Amino acid sequence: MILMRAPIVEVFSSIQGEGLLVGRRQIFVRFAGCNLNCSYCDTPESRDPSAGRLFTAPELTEIIEGLITPDFHSISITGGEPLLYPDFITELLEESPHRTLLETNGSLPSNAERIAHLFDYASVDIKIAEHFSDNLRSGTTESDISSPGDLIDREIQVINILISRGVNTYCKVVVMPTTGAGYIGALAERLLECVDEPERLPLVIQPCSPPEQWAQNTPRLLEMSQEAGKYMDVYVIPQMHRALGLR
């Protein structure tokens, strides 16, 4: 039998520094290849599929099991964009006894439909227009996304798929000092209107790194939180692993 292989940039154990599982010890499996071209990406090396080493699912499972510590909480399937590899992820996780987190840009609803049942938690990264300084599509991975509007429609589809499958889901939006509070409020209002069960979807506002650029802009974060809070349960959580010097 020929085993599937997928390009993996790295597998490592660390503390989750983002979102609602912040502080949890996780084993991170970072897939190579991404279909988007976000200006703030903190792992640009993972955009190119050729950047990863090819692994089979049994090879990855052996590495994961060797990294488990007494404080281990869950496996984070991240990237890049892991939804590019639904068949491989199915092979990797369908027999796994461990809790799992999917970290995704939410751009591939049909693939999310195929593997949502494999996850306990999901973080869907909502993209806004200012995240893309040029073309929103990655030049290294094929994509048929036509515009930021098309992208957010897909992200909402993925959120609804995950919630309907019982996955503990939150959405995250990375903000910059230039991001308007009204824009974030309008985004939260749209999520309230379009998500099937919005009461099950918290919104995490994540200030982009480095944190020093926010020294004179903390009132803006409070304004964003206040505007989003009119519609959703909202958190403001920076990248804690960056502050601690962790991966």
From Swiss-Prot:
UniProt keyword Metal-binding present: yes
Pathway stated in the Swiss-Prot or TrEMBL entry: Purine metabolism; 7-cyano-7-deazaguanine biosynthesis
Coiled coil, from the record: none
Reactions accelerated catalytically: 6-carboxy-5,6,7,8-tetrahydropterin + H(+) = 7-carboxy-7-deazaguanine + NH4(+)
E.C. designation(s): 4.3.99.3
The keyword S-adenosyl-L-methionine is annotated on this UniProt entry: yes
Residues holding [4Fe-4S] cluster: C34, C38, C41
Binding-site positions, substrate: I15, Q16, G17, R30, T78
Segment forming the signal sequence: none
Domain (Radical SAM core) ranges: 21-247
Cofactor(s) needed by this chain: [4Fe-4S] cluster; S-adenosyl-L-methionine; Mg(2+)
Family the UniProt entry places it in: Belongs to the radical SAM superfamily. 7-carboxy-7-deazaguanine synthase family.
PANTHER family cross-referenced by the UniProt entry: 7-CARBOXY-7-DEAZAGUANINE SYNTHASE (PTHR42836:SF1)
Name of the protein in question: 7-carboxy-7-deazaguanine synthase
